[in-house]
Regions:
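Solvent-exposed loop/turn segments connecting transmembrane beta-strands
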Residues: 3-4, 72-74
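A structural signal for well-ordered alpha-helical segments within the folded catalytic domains
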Residues: 6, 44-45, 77, 81, ...
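Hydrophobic/aromatic residues located in beta-strands of well-ordered beta-sheets
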Residues: 63, 96-98
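A generic secondary-structure signal
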Residues: 53, 82-89
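Structured beta-strand-rich core segments of catalytic domains in phosphoester-bond hydrolases
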Residues: 1-60, 165-167
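Metal-dependent phosphoester-hydrolase catalytic domains
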Residues: 17, 74, 78, 87-96, ...
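Active-site metal-binding loops of divalent metal-dependent hydrolases
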Residues: 66-68, 100-102
């Protein structure tokens, strides 16, 4: 249900720095308000969102975290379109951050839909400094080297990225992605 069982895409944040003003989930499918498989997806997939306020500066932004289907090509493309629509639907036109396991690399249709939307930009592409000796997909083989990035961090134009890094010396099979974001 996205809360106590099944798929969930948590957003971890510093409670001493940020306040959550509003939050929720929606399912990556034609029916967004309850768990279900969308389009050609193999599993129900979810996107969690929050509206955050920086306690010190008052800067307010949206944060989305998702997990796209690992098989359904149509599901991933439609999920990308759905995310863009959800961002546009918010009554306040706030800056937005979109992260997650997209289950496809930077050459895929769903990636291109997001990065070419004019709304979201890949933090990897716009970073002033990039540390990425390896991609984020290794097929569960930690020693495999690849340029393939399946975990992405997209931003709206209000953000600039000073430093971007893919940290492959973690305990996970899929590497963490890190970008230092600053609003203009």
């Amino acid at each position: 249900d996205g809360k106590r069982a099944g798929e969930h895409s948590a957003i971890f944040y510093r409670t001493d720095k940020f306040e959550v003003l509003e939050h929720g989930d929606f399912w990556l499918s034609e029916i967004t308000d309850r768990p279900n498989k969308g389009w050609d997806a193999v599993l129900p997939r979810i996107c969690t969102w929050g509206e955050f306020r920086d306690k010190q500066t008052g800067f307010t932004f949206l944060f989305f975290n998702l997990h796209m289907d690992h098989v359904g090509v149509q599901a991933r493309a439609e999920s990308a379109k759905l995310i863009l629509e959800k961002i546009k639907e918010f009554p306040k036109k706030l800056p937005a951050i979109l992260t997650g396991d997209f289950n496809v690399d930077q050459t895929s249709e769903s990636y291109q839909l997001l990065d070419g939307s004019g709304i979201m930009r890949d933090s990897y592409e716009i970073a002033d400094f990039r540390y990425a000796p390896n991609g984020t997909f290794n097929g569960f083989h930690p020693d495999r080297k690849t340029d393939s990035r399946i975990d992405h961090l997209f931003l709206t134009k209000e953000f600039e990225v000073k430093k971007y890094g893919i940290l492959t010396d973690t305990y996970r099979s899929e590497a963490k992605e890190s970008a230092r974001k600053e609003q203009n």
